[in-house]
Every structure is written in C-alpha cells, then in structure tokens.
Amino acid sequence: MTMKRWKSCGQSFRNNDRISELPEALLLEILSLLPTKDVRATSVLSNRWRSLWKMVPRLEFNERMVSDNISRCLLSHQAPVLQSLHLEMNSDVFSNMVIGILVGIAFGLHVRELVLYVYGSQELFRFPFSLCNCESLETLILGQNIIIDVPSPVCLNSLRTLDLDGVGYKDDESVLNLLSGCISLENLVVHRLEQADVKTFTLAVPSLQRLTLTAENDDEDSVYVINAPSLKYLKFDGVLDDTCLIENTPELVEASLRDRGVDDDDDVSDIVFGNILGSLTSVKRLSLEISASLEIKFPTGSIFSQLVSLELHTYEPEVWNLLSLMLDSSPILQVLKLIGKKYRRKDPVACMKWNQPKDVPECLLLHLETVVWKNYQGEIEVEKEVAKYILRNTSRLKKATFSNAYIRPEKRLERLKELESVVMASNSCQLVFKEVDITC
C-alpha cells in the first residue's frame, strides 16, 4: 500500500471515530462492561482516552495480573466513588498482606460493592474488618479461603447485602459481632461447608428481609438460630431438626425449606419439624422438600391462614400425609404444585396408603384454582388416589396440569384418559398432560 493510501485510511479512521464523540458518562458505562485489562488498554487510543479509564466505576482483577499493576490501577482511580471492585486472588500467588493492602485501598476509594474470593493452598486470609468503618459499602461478597475474625462489633451502617460463600469463622462471637454492626442489612446469603468452627450460628438481624442459608455441615453440635422480625423471604437448605430454630419471623411471606438430613431420633425430629412448620404460619408461599420418613406433627391449632401457594416434593412416603395436613390447615390455598421423582420408583415404601382428610378441606371447596403435578407417574397407587381425590373435590379448579418427560407418549395418553374418567367437581377445569417440564 502506498503512503498516500495509508494517509487516506488514517484520515478516514479519524473521521469515522464517532465513539469518542459520545458523552463521557456513556463512555464510562460502556467501559464498565469490559475486562479491566482491556479498559486500561484504551488509554493509547487518543488524548481523550488517556485518562478516561481512571474514571471507570467498576473494576475487576484476578490472579493472572501482577499485584503491582493492580495496586497502580487502584491508586490511579479518580472517580469520586468506586462503584464495584471484584478481586479473585490466589494465595499461592498473592500474600495475605498484599490482598489486605488491596482491600484497604478499596475502602479508601469509598467502594460500594466489594467481591473478594481467595483460592489456593496457603493459610486462610483474615478479612481486615478493622478497616470496615466504611460508610459507603453497600454490598460485600466474600468467598472460599477467608476467615471471619471479628473480636468486636463492626460499623457497616450502609451495608444492605452480605454474601458469605463457604468462608470460615473464628468463633460464635465473630458471627454476632459482624451481623450486629450491619444495622441496615436487608439481604443475607450464607453458605456453610463442613466446618465445626461455630457451635451456635445466630442470625439476629432486625432489618433483614431476605435470608438464604445453605448448611452443608453435618456437625451434630452446630445450631442455627434465626431471629429476624422483618424477614419476608427465607430459603433454608440443611438439616431440619433441633439444630434449626426459627424464633421470630412474624413478617415472613415466602419460605422454601429443603431437608437434607438423616434423623437418628424420629420422635424428636417429628416434633421439631412440626415446630418449624408452626413458626411459618404467616407465609403466603411455601415450598417443602423433606428427606426422611417422618410422621409429621405440628402444634395443635396451627393454621396457615395466609397461604395461597404450596409446593411439595413427593420423594418420601410421609409427604402424602403432610399434604393432607397442609390442605386441612390452609383454608385459602389457591395454587398446589407437586414435584415427583424424575424416574419411576420401585421401592414398596412409595406405595404406602394415603390417609385422605376426614372432611373435604375448605381450600378445595372454595379457593384452589391451579394444580401442577410435575413428574407424575400414574403407576404408584398413592399418586392415583391423591390425583383423583383432588379432581373429585376441588369445586373451583380452573386448570390441572400433569407432566412427565420420561414416559412414552402412549403412556401419557393412557394416564390422561384415566384422569379424564374422574367425575370432577369443577365443570370448567382444563385438564392437561404435558411432556415438557412445567412451572406454576
């Protein structure tokens, strides 16, 4: 190519460089979507771009970058507030001191969202909560090889979202001191691994509205205590026995409970699980998945007077009696969703007898409108009994949808005809049997 053509192409590029003419706020928003290393590379484009990257409000670094480069990038930052900083650090590459310095710089930049994951085989990184008197921090996400060591209450007055993903804790007091200093906390996610570092994990947060607690640790001595008077949404995945205490949740609207435990003392477990249900009577939406064959008992007179949507996983035989109990105790229930196993069960315990309610529940007579049954087999006798009972007695049912993607089309048609043979209480009910997975 001749020199003349080179000059012509260069002139054409400059004439077509329309992106540089965009408002600075829009350019910064665009740059925020790019990897930080690419954002820094834009400084060579022109004089205008030379310092623009220093104003980008969101930064992300990982262990592939040199610590000096990360430090220089943070120290060069000129935006009034650092909106978000993501750090993925390998402790085999970065020392705990270096990681601590980077976190300290972030606090000095008035960071609003800090995400820190530490990997590697070296000692756990102790998060510097002594630096946490930070009025700007609104979201804090900590994961993996981090230990929470908080000898005295922190001061995180603006923190609204806290996510503790598999981190460790020095002791019970560290949990209390961390949460007690988060006076505006609304969203809390806790993922506990098989750690025996905390005996009583107390979640006492007056402002908390959403809680997701996953407890993979099976330490019999560990206890979870939930005391959150403003809590509206609860998701618990762990052992539903006397190690889980829900003490004060009067505002609870939605709860999802998944029991992954194997109980040694069935009598105690029956009562405790019943007490847990008894503490959820204010909910409007409830999902239950139990793993053990329990004879469910909950306190006499417990009424789910607000419950409009119920989801039950029908993996265990006692779920059917739990269903009877819940129908009797939920007078305004409108939506019922049952979720079965994906594949057919051949174990005889699945064929136990269902004890249907003595009287037709009020919700079936007056309120239930939608039934969804996912992975309906139609071969297990108890399933057929329950399905036919619901169709025969639900006066205002508008739609009943069954599905199973794991049986042949001719079998699905056979199941549908069997269900259609039932004399239904509702004249306007639409009965459907689908192949694909369905949701409410």
Per-region residue spans from a language model:
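C-terminal helix/juxtamembrane-tail motif
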Residues: 1-4, 405-440
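A structural signal for leucine-rich repeat
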Residues: 100-105, 128-134, 151-159, 175-183, ...
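Conserved hydrophobic position(s) of the canonical leucine-rich repeat
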Residues: 56, 82, 111-114, 137, ...
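LRR N-terminal entry segment and analogous cap-like coil->beta motifs
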Residues: 57-62, 77-92, 109-119, 137-138, ...
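Leucine-rich repeat
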Residues: 2-5, 10-204, 363, ...
